[in-house]
Amino acid sequence: MQKGLILYMGYYGRYTAAYSIGCLLMLSLYIAGIFLHWAAFGVLLVLTLAGVMLLAVICSVLGTRRFNAAYQRFLTSCDAAAFLAEIRGCQRWQNRSTRPNLALNESFALQALGRGPEALEALSRMGMDRVPRRSKSCLQQLRLSVYTRQASIAIGLEDYAAARSQLAYLRDEVRTLPAGNALFGHFSKAVLDLEHMMAVQRGEPGGHTAYFRTELGLAPNSYLRAQASYYLACALLLEENDAAGAVPLYEQARALAPQLWVAARAGAALNALHAREAAQPSAGI
């Protein structure tokens, strides 16, 4: 039983250590009861087992909450380097249960830093064949997340053949979900996002300005606002040739996420716009 509970520990060594120490203390109490022939031996056994399980739940919840808080800080601050450092610290204590989520988040952080090949390598280290047996829905969510991340990275690397392949897998997997399922709504939206992003990067017009304007208005954090600002600026140039409208959006993307890929892309786009303006002949008087 203890091995199974330890398998689902949280992400941090302090909680694993607290669990181990607590288990040792309760085991010591249990052994003492055996040697001292306490009358309440049966009650002590039940309390020891209950204490072990309760401690496992508490430590797992605390570790998961702390990791989720680090993820939210990243989305708010766009400090991918700090989030990556947090993940690397957790990986020292990873197990079969925490490895998939850590690999997905490591891949996300590396992609945000513009390190696409390393992000793909992080996903490959996850090893779907080593993922523990879980419920069918958990495994399906993991597959959906991997397809989404691989498609997103491929788009960033401008490997559109790979992106289309991963999007096809993602669409096929989404079709197997019931329409009212929460995963259906989330990953159907992910498919739309990725399709619009890829089309904008490939220079294929098709209602992207309206889509990303809506995305920018609904973006709940700095990371998504920076991403939506960048793609809205690209869409304005593509569909409306609106350089005046694109410039402040590129600048906003750089200001929101100065250390991330989106800032580098926005900076390159601004430089290209300025070069184009400089190359245009000035109007005569």
Model-assigned labels for residue ranges:
Residues 44-74:
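Transmembrane alpha-helices and immediately adjacent membrane-cytoplasm interface residues
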Residues 40-46, 71-88, 111-129, 159-173, ...:
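Helix-turn-helix repeat elements of alpha-solenoid scaffolds
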